[in-house]
Curated annotation (Swiss-Prot):
Part of the 50S ribosomal subunit. This is Large ribosomal subunit protein uL22. The keyword ATP-binding does not apply. GO terms for biological process: translation. It holds the Pfam family Ribosomal_L22. Keywords: Ribonucleoprotein, Ribosomal protein, RNA-binding, rRNA-binding. The gene is rplV. It comes from the Bacteria. The keyword Signal does not apply. Belongs to the universal ribosomal protein uL22 family. Disulfide bonds: none annotated. Coiled coil: none annotated. Gene3D superfamilies: Ribosomal protein L22/L17. GO terms for cellular component: cytosolic large ribosomal subunit.
Amino acid sequence: MEAIAKHRFASISPQKARLVADQIRGKSVDQALEILTFSNKKAAVIIKKVVESAIANAEHNEGADIDDLNVAKIFVDEGPIMKRIMPRAKGRADRILKRSSHITIVVADR
């Protein structure tokens, strides 16, 4: 059985979130939470909440045992990009891209 949790429009770039996602792919949920707890990346805090949500979904909706769960799939897709302007010298302007992510986690039995 599988349980899914998503965090859409997370305010972190997909490139940075994928660094953390690659570390927990295929691990047991206990091991994944441990890795995320001791990581000092912003993405780790966001992804940890999604993993905890997926665990709660598996327990509540599917009646799964937490000890048997592992991170079957985790992927980070690109969300919408907000474009902002940063004023520069001599009347010029640069574009700043505020990137967002859609984080999806699937937990399943081993």
